[in-house]
């Protein structure tokens, strides 16, 4: 069973992530994780924090000489600004007079609409929102990306799976493409200022961001994640919690500010007749023995992969920390107030796409291990080869008939 957890606050000393259940023998290095953390910083409309957050990381367990050892993989990512926050965010008690003298420790009593601020204060009985926003911050996703890199390398080394993402809409601007990007397109996407596939809509997306910044506003958007190389049979139709589409949706919805998930052309299919919604099946030569005329299902049927590329989309709402503050209530005085503004991005949609890749990788790695088992990469690979050999054998028998 693959499990993972993160800990740490946005302005604490560090973030920590632990991945348990990964097989031994997966090749991964500090440099591999650092490269993915750099990708997480990509995108037009970033906050100044992205420019100075160094993401200094250390693998503190589970990897030796560039290979996983079968034990929990633990990663620590230092927060660059910790020295400025050492007293405000200290784990041990600090002299109240010292805290009172610190501007950074001013109570945050004007919760932001759309943020976890108020609901978290009500749930945990806090008098201000600092304890909520520190953990609710999307800074936490850096820890997810760290352990997700291990999952991504496992999938690539076991099955040749490649996962990529791109921005399909930003604010009111949609990217213009009539086909999916492939693994060879990833570098071009990462080099694009808004991580769009193709340049047709890039300038309009950037203009949308600039306009929002000028107005003191923020933007949301939609990202798409595609996984190539998955064999049929990952996931299950048998139980609700084993359905791969359900697990993917839950994982993507766990990303900060994600408010909707679509598998394949799910929402468009809701407006079509069945004859125009489903992917017809045709005979084909070779080990797959069938082919699809389309991939509107996004590679999943009945909660199981069907051999087509896996395609999922996630909708991200606009960031809730706006320079043009929204109306709120001061929780101390009970009087109307303007919501506080923390330093934030104008849009985090391009970065959210990279985080979405991470969540897809973690879910797929767990499902693949459930399907094939094993304690080491070579053992799991043998199990995969046996399964694929069985698929080929059945395909050959059908073709002989």
UniProtKB/Swiss-Prot annotation:
GO terms for molecular function: chorismate synthase activity; FMN binding. PROSITE patterns: CHORISMATE_SYNTHASE_1 (PS00787), CHORISMATE_SYNTHASE_2 (PS00788). GO terms for cellular component: cytosol. Its cofactor is FMNH2. Transmembrane segments: none annotated. Pathway: Metabolic intermediate biosynthesis; chorismate biosynthesis; chorismate from D-erythrose 4-phosphate and phosphoenolpyruvate: step 7/7. SUPFAM superfamilies: Chorismate synthase, AroC. FMN binds at residues 135-137, 256-257, 302, 317-321, 343. It catalyses: 5-O-(1-carboxyvinyl)-3-phosphoshikimate = chorismate + phosphate. Coiled coil: none annotated. Reduced FMN (FMNH(2)). Keywords: Amino-acid biosynthesis, Aromatic amino acid biosynthesis, FAD, Flavoprotein, FMN, Lyase, NADP. One of its GO terms (biological process) is amino acid biosynthetic process. Pfam families: Chorismate_synt (PF01264). Homotetramer. This reaction introduces a second double bond into the aromatic ring system. HAMAP family: Chorismate_synth. Belongs to the chorismate synthase family. This is Chorismate synthase. It comes from Saccharopolyspora erythraea (strain ATCC 11635 / DSM 40517 / JCM 4748 / NBRC 13426 / NCIMB 8594 / NRRL 2338).
């Amino acid at each position: 069973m693959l499990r993972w957890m993160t800990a740490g606050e946005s302005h604490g000393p560090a973030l920590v992530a632990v991945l348990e259940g990964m097989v031994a023998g997966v090749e991964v290095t500090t440099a591999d994780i650092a490269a993915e953390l750099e990708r997480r910083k990509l995108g037009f409309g970033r906050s100044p924090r992205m420019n100075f957050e160094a993401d200094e990381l250390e693998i503190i367990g589970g990897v030796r000489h560039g290979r996983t050892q079968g034990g929990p993989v633990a990663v620590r990512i230092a927060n660059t600004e910790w020295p400025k926050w050492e007293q405000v965010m200290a784990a041990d008690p600090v002299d109240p007079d010292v805290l009172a003298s610190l501007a950074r420790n001013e109570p945050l009593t004007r919760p932001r609409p759309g943020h976890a601020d108020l609901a978290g204060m009500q749930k945990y009985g806090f008098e201000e929102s600092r304890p909520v926003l520190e953990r609710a911050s999307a800074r936490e996703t850096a820890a997810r990306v760290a352990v997700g890199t291990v999952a991504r390398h496992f999938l690539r080394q076991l099955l040749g799976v490649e996962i990529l993402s791109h921005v399909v809409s930003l604010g009111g601007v949609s990217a213009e493409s009539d086909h999916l990007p492939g693994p060879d397109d990833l570098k071009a996407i990462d080099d694009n200022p808004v991580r769009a596939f193709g340049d047709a809509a890039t300038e309009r997306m950037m203009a949308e961001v600039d306009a929002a910044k000028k107005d003191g506003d923020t933007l949301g958007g939609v990202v798409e994640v595609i996984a190539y190389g998955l064999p049929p049979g990952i996931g299950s139709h048998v139980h609700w919690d084993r359905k791969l589409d359900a697990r993917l949706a839950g994982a993507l919805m766990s990303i900060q500010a994600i408010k909707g998930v679509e598998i394949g052309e799910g929402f468009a299919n809701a407006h079509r007749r069945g004859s125009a919604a489903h992917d017809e099946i045709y005979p084909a030569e070779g080990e797959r023995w069938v082919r699809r005329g389309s991939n509107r299902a996004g590679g999943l049927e009945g909660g199981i992969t069907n051999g087509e590329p896996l395609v999922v989309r996630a909708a991200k709402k606009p960031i809730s920390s706006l320079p043009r503050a929204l109306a709120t209530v001061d929780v101390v005085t009970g009087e109307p107030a303007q919501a506080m503004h923390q330093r934030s991005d104008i849009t985090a949609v391009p970065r959210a796409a990279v985080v979405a890749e991470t969540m897809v990788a973690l879910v797929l790695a767990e499902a693949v291990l459930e399907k094939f088992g094993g304690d080491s990469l070579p053992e799991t690979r043998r199990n995969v080869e046996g399964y694929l050999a069985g698929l080929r054998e059945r395909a050959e028998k059908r073709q002989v008939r």
